[in-house]
Amino acid sequence: MSVKIRKGDLVQVITGSKTGGKKGKQGRVLAVSGDRVWVEGVNLTTRHRKRVTNDKGTSSGGLEKRESPMHISNVALVDPETGAPTKVGFLVKTSGDKTVRVRFAKKSGKELT
């Protein structure tokens, strides 16, 4: 399967009941693992961490908010020109003897880096 969404991309939540009603929210991709994606500021869950004191006498623990994974089909890449969700296509470019696959936004045709 081709990797259409990568770490650092700006994506928008397009659907999904497990996303906590965050349809339409945009954020940067923190990580991608298989068919799961972590989006910054979206699908936050609260983790309860046990309070632990380290050697210096400071303690850490309590409630911690962090992003949870969601299915990659629930997000779409944001077009850099229009700011709307778009599909991703691939172009094969040849320069000399090298061939490179480049992602592009299907709505505007602009190349994605």
Curated annotation (Swiss-Prot):
InterPro entries associated with the record: Rib_uL2_dom2 (IPR014722), Ribosomal_uL24 (IPR003256), Ribosomal_uL24_KOW (IPR041988), Translation_prot_SH3-like_sf (IPR008991)
Gene3D superfamilies in the record: 2.30.30.30
Calcium listed as a keyword: no
Family: Belongs to the universal ribosomal protein uL24 family.
The protein's name in its UniProt record: Large ribosomal subunit protein uL24
Region feature (Disordered): 48-70
This protein's record includes keyword Ribosomal protein: yes
Assembly and binders: Part of the 50S ribosomal subunit.
Disulfide bonds listed in the record: none
Highest taxon of source: Bacteria
GO terms under biological process: translation
Molecular function in Gene Ontology: rRNA binding; structural constituent of ribosome
Function: One of two assembly initiator proteins, it binds directly to the 5'-end of the 23S rRNA, where it nucleates assembly of the 50S subunit.
Keywords: Ribonucleoprotein, Ribosomal protein, RNA-binding, rRNA-binding
Organism, scientific name: Tropheryma whipplei (strain Twist) (Whipple's bacillus)
GO CC terms: ribonucleoprotein complex; ribosome
